[in-house]
UniProtKB/Swiss-Prot annotation:
It comes from Sus scrofa (Pig). Component of the complex IV (CIV, cytochrome c oxidase), a multisubunit enzyme composed of 14 subunits. The complex is composed of a catalytic core of 3 subunits MT-CO1, MT-CO2 and MT-CO3, encoded in the mitochondrial DNA, and 11 supernumerary subunits COX4I1 (or COX4I2), COX5A, COX5B, COX6A2 (or COX6A1), COX6B1 (or COX6B2), COX6C, COX7A1 (or COX7A2), COX7B, COX7C, COX8B and NDUFA4, which are encoded in the nuclear genome. This is Cytochrome c oxidase subunit 7A1, mitochondrial. Disulfide bonds: none annotated. GO terms for biological process: mitochondrial electron transport, cytochrome c to oxygen; mitochondrial respirasome assembly. One of its GO terms (molecular function) is cytochrome-c oxidase activity.
């Protein structure tokens, strides 16, 4: 029973300290993303969002092209 209390105290102290260190920045992010500046929402976060968007689109396009290539390669008979 004592071990249970000790473990609960440890979990409580770790979870509360981690929660107290982080400040709530939701209001700041809401102002940024709700601003009327004619940018798409996936680019309002700045350069990081732009890079992340381009990398994601490149990987998706590359995967699509590669899957079509593999389908084309598999659809023709192979010489043995």
């Amino acid at each position: 029973m004592r071990a249970l209390r000790v473990s609960q105290a440890l979990v409580r102290s770790f979870s509360s300290t981690a929660r107290n260190r982080l400040e709530n920045r939701v209001a700041e992010k809401q102002k940024i993303f709700q601003a009327d500046n004619d940018l798409p929402v996936h680019l309002k976060g700045g350069a990081t969002d732009n890079i992340l968007y381009r990398v994601t689109m490149t990987l998706c396009l590359g995967g699509t092209v590669y899957s079509l290539y593999c389908l084309g390669w598999a659809s023709f008979p192979h010489k043995k």
